[in-house]
A protein has these predicted regions:
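Conserved NAD(P)H cofactor-binding loop of Rossmann-fold oxidoreductase domains
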Residues: 65
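ATP-binding/phosphotransfer module of carbohydrate and carboxylate kinases, centering on a glycine-rich
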Residues: 1-59, 68-76, 94, 98-103, ...
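A charged helix-plus-loop insertion that forms the helical arch/lid used to bind
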Residues: 74-89
Length: 299
């Protein structure tokens, strides 16, 4: 029986799971994210125990925070790069999991969530989806025909600079770009600007954040032509924000894209898998490793 080890590596917690080849989770655990020497060692030890209970692992699938090298052809594949998470720059998943001697498939946390929603959630039935999380940071994963899309690295949609209304001169709080999307519409930016989150915010604040995110939604439509866009994360739970985003996206597109010039209640949606999107995607990454190994071995 081919078993998959899966990791959803977040900035505050790690979700670990061992699953059948069909994706059924046999056991799972949660770890706090600390220094990589502690966290990765603890994760590897948990997988050793889980494997002793369920059987040997055939592959790992990992959906991780970053920035992280996700190019399988790179000598630094699976290595954290310029992450602001203290101690994590230079840490490698391969080092911690070398004892298992199995292949690893590594992608970003948002790509993992996008893949999970594509396969088993709100993205089902669409050829291309774009999944955006708006929380501590802002990031987007795109999946086409069942595979995450990337270039030399993962997308950084949160660092696009939106057009801003006249008189909106708050400088933003991104340490790199100031008033990029992440510096204006992430959870920390909203708190820094107004001193509260959007859970009970006045309509004008909801509308302004929707305007910022509408810039991103329009860019995703124009660049990727998704059949569906999913917006998740803590900020998107604010009452009325998703509806405002639909309105501003349609208005900003100006009728130019026929498929998006209509009511967008089925085109811009909330996630369906909740907190399980990331681990579902990580399992799928691991399953792809097993399939590729089977093809390479031949009949």
């Amino acid at each position: 029986m081919s078993l998959v080890g899966a990791i959803e590596a977040g900035g505050t917690k790690f979700i670990l799971a061992i699953a059948n080849r069909d994706g059924t989770i046999l056991e799972r655990a949660r770890l706090d994210t600390r220094h990589p020497d502690e966290t990765l060692c603890e994760a590897a030890t948990w997988f050793e125990g889980a494997a002793s209970r369920h059987g040997a692992l055939s592959a790992f699938g990992i959906a991780s925070f970053g920035p992280i090298d996700i190019d399988p052809g790179s000598p630094t594949y699976g290595t954290f790069t310029t992450t602001p998470k203290p101690g994590w720059s230079g840490a490698r998943f391969h080092d911690a999991l070398a004892r298992f001697d199995v292949p690893l498939a590594i992608d970003t946390d948002v790509n993992g969530a996008a893949l999970g929603e594509y396969l088993a959630g709100a993205g089902q039935g669409a050829r291309t989806i774009a999944y955006t999380t708006v929380g501590t940071g802002i990031g987007t994963g795109v999946v086409t025909d069942g595979a995450p899309v990337s270039g030399i690295s993962h997308f950084e949609s949160g660092h696009l600079r939106p057009a801003r209304p006249h008189g909106d001169d708050w400088p933003g709080n991104c340490p790199y770009h100031g008033d990029c999307l992440e510096g204006l519409a992430s959870g920390p930016a909203i708190l820094a600007r107004w001193g509260h989150d959007l859970s009970a915010a006045p309509e004008e604040q909801i509308s302004l954040v929707a305007d910022y995110l509408g810039e991103l939604a329009c860019a995703l439509v124009l660049l990727h032509m998704p059949g569906r866009m999913i917006f998740g994360g803590g900020v998107m739970k604010a009452p009325g924000l998703l509806e405002a985003l639909r309105r501003t996206t349609r208005a900003r597109l100006g009728g130019y894209i026929a498929a998006w010039d209509r009511d967008l209640s089925e085109m811009i949606v909330a996630p369906a898998l909740g907190d399980d999107a990331g681990i579902t995607g990580a399992i799928a990454l691991g399953r792809s490793c097993i399939r590729e190994a089977s093809v390479a071995e031949g009949p």
